[in-house]
Amino acid sequence: MRIAFSKLCVVRPALTTRLLAGLALAGALLLAAAPRAEAQPTAALPAMSLSAVTTGPARPIAAWAEFCERYPDECAVDRTEPASITLTPALWQTINAVNRRINRSVEAVTDGDHWQAADRWDLAEDGRGDCEDFQLLKRRLLVEAGLPRRAMRMTVVIDEKGEGHAVLTLITNRGDLVLDNKTNAVLPWRQTGYTFVKRESQEAVGWMALGRDASPLTAANR
């Protein structure tokens, strides 16, 4: 079954290069503040939840493959990196800060308006992009803040409207958590209300199915 994807976007203020640098610096500062954050109660961390289970290889999205040709380092899988993030209050603060700031600052536009293309994956470094571009930029900033790329996987879902959408899954010791441009809340995957289709593999450059017999043609532009 193939799934059509929405082209709707909500416009937000543009993100400048200076702000991008500021976001990376903010993440580093939050990590440097770890001793103070560690003094916070454990309740500051998300509750324990179950992780998603992959069921086998899945077909990559063509636009993702093209993105990997342009940005091979963004898709590379380093198996010496941790496969899971051990959350601390400081890391949790960094994750939430990056998610909120990118959601607030990037202007959501369709690939047609942005690139004159049906589907294109890119980093929203010019301050414009659709859902996957938001998540790819968040991942880059989180990597710069010290989190392992291998534990942050681009993920295709079906949203509450039955439309395709792209989110970023963080695989952690407290379960799989989702960063999404449609909400500032970082939620356990089962609490998103989405149907999870597939995500990037942690073992090689490719994709793994998450239990639904569906192969979206593009990532959602939401």
Predicted regions and their residues:
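Bacterial N-terminal signal peptides
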Residues: 14-32
